[in-house]
Amino acid sequence: MTHVLRARRLLTEEGWLDDHQLRIADGVIAAIEPIPVSVTERDAELLCPAYIDTHVHGGAGVDVMDDAPDVLDKLAMHKAREGVGSWLPTTVTAPLSTIHAALKRIAQRCQRGGPGAQVLGSYLEGPYFTPQNKGAHPPELFRELEIAELDQLIAVSQHTLRVVALAPEKEGALQAIRHLKQQNVRVMLGHSAATWQQTRAAFDAGADGLVHCYNGMTGLHHREPGMVGAGLTDKRAWLELIADGHHVHPAAMSLCCCCAKERIVLITDAMQAAGMPDGRYTLCGEEVQMHGGVVRTASGGLAGSTLSVDAAVRNMVELTGVTPAEAIHMASLHPARMLGVDGVLGSLKPGKRASVVALDSGLHVQQIWIQGQLASF
């Protein structure tokens, strides 16, 4: 089946094309071509690659860790509403048996498919952290790194485990990083008190970047650059960024752009309160409170976010001054490259999957097509 989507402006990796159309065949972009002069209708103001959210714990009142049959479908529809065409359900620190169960459910969803945004695999955030910058993760459940245990996680996930987060100062971390990379698993560094030197050693071992840059890690000091300094200055490192203006000050967001504009991966780190009213929710098994859209633990620490990807894109434009094209790439092309799926996702290009979002001039989501099919909200 072939159909055409026409836009006043269409975003490619190279930039905007005015008055162009996508020709889509069997869920794949077959061609990008000028709209015939005789055709005046447009399907969208802006056609862009659908967003990829690589770090999602929950939303719409549900959590990835919930053992219920419709949780991932509900979350996938929630993500599609914010312009996300594909995503990684993300686990949290919990008993190993609970993590295994979540990874199995995610693997099953990958295999069977379903409504909404496509599930690309899983992201393991915890239990391989250290206590100093634990965030909302319960330190009593932190575990040591063992190759056999990592292999078991990969096996339980039926090889759908895409990302493992860990603290690079843990014993055995460098060996674990090398092993995970051999298994084609990405490694992100976070919830850690690592030094600049320890972080650089982890990048040398193959680690891919930082978990929500600035949050849950050693900050930048002029005599001890810490994890943030290592990430900002190492061109090998992808930098996850929660661009809600609460987790990271706009000036620090701008600094990230100055140092690493081509390496920023916009994430939501969203938890079950995303898209919901203020009130009490749970994260990592603990009660948290959302007020004014900001979620905090009982001790006052930030506990995940309620951010949407489309809002993150708008925030980057408004708060840091990057162009709309640059911000959109941070939420599409960059995460695709980080995951190694940029051959099929992340930009509008012939041969890639037709994962497409229509935006208005204010970068608000109007419609989304996932593998060429219009998603209904």
Curated annotation (Swiss-Prot):
It comes from the Bacteria. A divalent metal cation binds at residues 125, 191, 212. GO terms for molecular function: metal ion binding; N-acetylgalactosamine-6-phosphate deacetylase activity; N-acetylglucosamine-6-phosphate deacetylase activity. The lineage of its organism: Bacteria, Pseudomonadati, Pseudomonadota, Gammaproteobacteria, Enterobacterales. It holds the Pfam family HutF_N. It is an enzyme of class 3 (hydrolase). It comes from Escherichia coli O157:H7. NagA and AgaA can substitute for each other and function in both the N-acetyl-D-glucosamine and N-acetyl-D-galactosamine pathways. Disruption phenotype: AgaA deletion mutant, but not agaA-nagA double mutant, can grow on N-acetyl-D-galactosamine. AgaA deletion mutant is probably able to grow on N-acetyl-D-galactosamine because NagA can substitute for the absence of AgaA. Deletion of agaA does not affect N-acetyl-D-glucosamine utilization. Substrate binds at residues 136-137, 215-216, 223, 244-247, 302-304. SUPFAM superfamilies: Composite domain of metallo-dependent hydrolases, Metallo-dependent hydrolases. Catalyzes the deacetylation of N-acetyl-D-galactosamine 6-phosphate to D-galactosamine 6-phosphate. Can probably also catalyze the deacetylation of N-acetyl-D-glucosamine 6-phosphate to D-glucosamine 6-phosphate. This is N-acetylgalactosamine-6-phosphate deacetylase. InterPro entries: Amidohydro-rel (IPR006680), GlcNAc_6-P_deAcase (IPR003764), HutF-like_N (IPR055156), Metal-dep_hydrolase_composite (IPR011059), Metal_Hydrolase (IPR032466). It catalyses: N-acetyl-D-galactosamine 6-phosphate + H2O = D-galactosamine 6-phosphate + acetate. Its cofactor is a divalent metal cation. Keywords: Carbohydrate metabolism, Hydrolase, Metal-binding. Transmembrane segments: none annotated. One of its GO terms (biological process) is N-acetylglucosamine catabolic process. Belongs to the metallo-dependent hydrolases superfamily. NagA family. The active site is at 269 (proton donor/acceptor). Binds 1 divalent metal cation per subunit. Coiled coil: none annotated. Its EC number is 3.5.1.-. The gene is agaA.
